[in-house]
């Protein structure tokens, strides 16, 4: 069983699966490093076997999903991949359990399709790649709650489309509360505008 090594750190689980879209979680994982010891980021897959990302990187998960104690998880992150139209039952069951207990879940691109498949978007405001993308999910009845935004947060569930990794990461940072808001704002300003003033603010806040 994988458990937290420090009682005050927050365990963030990034789901590792074949064809996971590298750009969708890159800003997120790098940005979490700014939180230092406040965050422990682990990758977890259906098994601990190596997966290949969409960009061709070989990732060996830190753990299998079965090795995790759901009570230890502070956030579950579901990246996009080419395979979300079916399967992934183990991680989707975990997502449903976490949502029921109030633990935040963050899904981007294909990950939102997974949430739609298990009903987690039926009553929450959400976004994705497009409304008809989520329409591929059997049983999805949440179309009235779809919002054409870069990222949406509602009732503990963060959703974003494939082209919004920055907004996705920002929403995760804010939900975790592991970084001061001025740091998040400076980080977001830097990567959306490239302006020096945000870099100076970010460095000055560290």
Where do the model's predicted regions map?
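Charged, often glycine-rich, active-site loop that binds/positions anionic groups
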Residues: 55-61
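Active-site-adjacent pocket-lining segments in enzyme domains
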Residues: 2-20, 30-47, 62-106, 110-206
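Acidic surface patches and DE-rich sequence motifs
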Residues: 52-53, 128
